[in-house]
Amino acid sequence: INNNTTGVCDQYEDYTNLFTDVTEGQSYNIDISLGDCSNNYPSGGKVFIDWNIDGDFNDPGEEVGTIPIGLPSTTTIPFTVPFSGAYGATRVRIVSQFLNNTLVGSIGPCDIGVMANPIYIQPWYGATEDYSIVINSATVSANYLWSNFATTDSISNLSIVTYTVDITDQNGC
């Protein structure tokens, strides 16, 4: 996903229409170019992924990385897709904050900043953005049924006739 956002502290943005596919057990990187809310204020943030697709970011391992406090820069956050058995579309949340003497550790997945110029309204101001990833299984489990009643994924030593195969995946499709 490559998305150059507005660069302003606009609270929450829903970019879940932007997605990429990932496969369990594989490693990936998220490269985040964190801007600021003006005047080169130091910012930091966190990245969360809803691995079990339960609609929140509160489960162990769903906080996948920290964007260290600093002036605008790019941070690479590596992650490995866990073998969770949850497949399909889920959310990636990036929370960035102007850290007015606040530690990055205090940033939570449900934080949505508030900004009013020229006064900062607590708890902070920044941006929260949601994206999507589609989690795919590392292996595709399937059942095979050939017209000669074989049940393996391939057959050999065949007569010259037409063969058909019905393949059913782990979802019964």
Regions found by a protein language model. Give the residues of each.
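Solvent-exposed segments in extracellular or luminal domains encompassing
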Residues: 68-82, 153-170
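Histidine/glycine-enriched, metal-chelating micro-motifs
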Residues: 54, 172-173
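A broad "non-catalytic interaction surface" signal
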Residues: 1-137
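Surface-exposed, flexible coil segments in extracellular/virion-facing regions
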Residues: 60, 140-158
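Append "Rare intracellular matches occur via the same short Y/T/C beta-strand/loop motifs
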Residues: 29-32, 142-144, 161-171
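Extracellular/surface recognition and adhesion modules
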Residues: 49, 94, 133, 146, ...
